[in-house]
């Protein structure tokens, strides 16, 4: 099974200078676990902020989420893979880098995201098809 078959095409973005509080609101409202952080300028790259980042880097340290910018704690650069990569390769990358999602990119454009749950769901679908 290929990344393009299981990727989620709905990507939620947040500005580099938005507060972590803004990110928390958006993530809770949309019931999502990560946001792509837009570059601060043309020389910067996309990043990602996750529930895990917020809990461990802000809430767990009792920092003020209204004073910290998402760009300060975003992971950069995004881990990007080709849309035709096998999900087995993606899962080994996730294990190697201890990450829960990879982004499907093409010519600096983000096409989608594959998270751990997507791989699990893809595995179920493949088994149901007799694969």
Residue locations for each model-derived region?
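Short, surface-exposed, polar/charged, turn-prone segments marking secondary-structure boundaries
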Residues: 19, 41-43, 63-67, 75-77, ...
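Short N-terminal leader segment in a subset of presequences, especially plant chloroplast
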Residues: 8-17, 43
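A glycine-centered beta-loop-beta connector
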Residues: 27, 35-51, 94, 102-117
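Tandem CBS (Bateman) regulatory domains
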Residues: 1-10, 48-79, 86-95, 113-131
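The conserved cystathionine-beta-synthase
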Residues: 14-32, 38-39, 80-98, 105-106, ...
């Amino acid at each position: 099974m290929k990344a393009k078959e299981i990727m989620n095409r709905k990507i939620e973005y947040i500005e580099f200078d938005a507060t972590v509080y803004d990110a928390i609101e958006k993530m809770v409202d949309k019931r999502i676990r990560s946001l792509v952080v837009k570059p601060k300028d043309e020389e910067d790259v996309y990043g990602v902020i996750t529930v895990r980042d917020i809990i461990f880097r802000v809430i767990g340290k009792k920092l003020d989420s209204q004073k910290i910018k998402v760009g300060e704690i975003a992971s950069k650069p995004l881990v990007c893979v080709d849309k035709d990569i096998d999900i087995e390769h993606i899962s080994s990358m996730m294990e190697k880098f201890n990450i829960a999602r990879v982004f499907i990119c093409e010519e600096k454009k983000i096409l989608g995201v594959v998270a751990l749950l997507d791989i699990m769901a893809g595995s179920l679908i493949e088994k149901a098809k007799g694969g």
